Amino acid sequence: MPKPAAGRIDETRPFQPVRIAVLTVSDTRSEADDKSGRTLVELIERDRHKVAARAIVKDDVRAIATKLREWIADPAVEVVISTGGTGVTGRDVTPEAFESLFEKKIDGFGELFRMLSWGKIGTSTMQSRAVGGVAGGTYLFALPGSPGACRDGWEDILRWQLDIRFRPCNLAELMPRLQEHLKK
């Protein structure tokens, strides 16, 4: 396993796979030619997590939000990672769909994604509206639609934050507490 830029894996802790749904947002892709979705699936499985579901939806706020709500309600899904629709064109509406459902936005995810992308694509990173947040006890992350962006988002951020062994802290260990405000 490669080393993260900062932090470390605590090998004394057992690995716990996370159940992840992969959503491709595209008007033109099918599963046969969905390179970005396939990239995410391969990376998730390589790192021993579970692909709980996979789907492709059109660039439409309602279609995206409907699929997200379905997965948020599904106890078999702990995390959703999407690819596509995060740019600035008229059809790019993934962030709007995600943010309409967020109970809490994870601002640092988009900020960190763009910071890391700066070293690879320079000022073009300003076109990315990658977002992350929490809804219904489920983590939601929206990545751009290129295989490279999916690889970067997974390799540089999510693989570490979804590994309960990552130190000094990680998002995986917070999953049991995401809905503690609902408990009395």
What function would you assign to each model-found segment?
Residues M1-K184:
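Non-catalytic beta/alpha edge segments that cap or flank active sites
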